[in-house]
Amino acid sequence: MRQQYDTSAPPAAFSVADAFMLRTALDALGGVRGLDTLDVACGHGSTARLLASGGARRTVGVDSCPERIRRARAHETGETGEAGAVEYHVADAAGMPQLGPFDLATAVYLFNQAHDRVALHAMFRAVRANLRPGARLLAIVPNPGAFPHVDWSPYGIRIVERTPGGDAPLLRARLETDPPVAFECREWAHADFAEAAVDAGFATVAWQPTRTPPACEIRDEPYWARYRSAPVSSLMNCVA
């Protein structure tokens, strides 16, 4: 989803939850200090900057959209015109070149963009090919089966239509921003992601429990409890 909706607007609740879940997972692993890190489908670079600011030895961001990479680089250089801490590349995830090896890769809403099973498996293989043995992939992926049973609009996203067909149903959705932003993705099952990861050479695949930020005045604990009962996403943890 990120590839299609990355904007400069304040983050929606589901995006805030995603960022918290990813940071929590990174902290549980001991952080990224001294690691070589890769962020695939980096968008405007928020996760890549998180990795760099955490002390990664090297951080590389990859995205298929030249404009998103341009904006990510612009954010890095700022007004000084100096090179930033993140190295950015324009590349399609399924055909990503050898940029590593890396100790850690992150992918936020990458794999749901695969239009068929061939592309899905190619994405996982390209990520695995850039990782050292024992390295880790942390991927945030959408949860399937929500439409039409779950309303995610209070958290910033609405599924509008689900069309069966192909290797996975096509979802038409929109971000509840002002103005709304429409996007499409595929509704892959968790088992499809796991199968592709194992096929790519990952030794283990695990799923992290959903975690949400502490309650605040804007989003209290009942709000987050409702979110946890039917979360937008899950965190996939794969070891090479």
Features from the language model and the residues they span:
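Conserved class I S-adenosyl-L-methionine
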Residues: 1-32, 46, 50
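C-terminal lobe and adjacent flexible extensions of AdoMet/dcAdoMet transferase-like proteins
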Residues: 196, 200-240
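Short catalytic micro-motifs in class I SAM-dependent methyltransferases
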Residues: 109-113
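A conserved beta-strand element that flanks and buttresses the S-adenosyl-L-methionine
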Residues: 106
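Class I SAM-dependent methyltransferase SAM/SAH-binding core
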Residues: 38, 44-95
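SAM-dependent methyltransferase
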Residues: 138-198
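A short glycine-rich, Lys/Arg-flanked "PGG" loop and its adjoining helix->strand segment in the class I
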Residues: 121-133
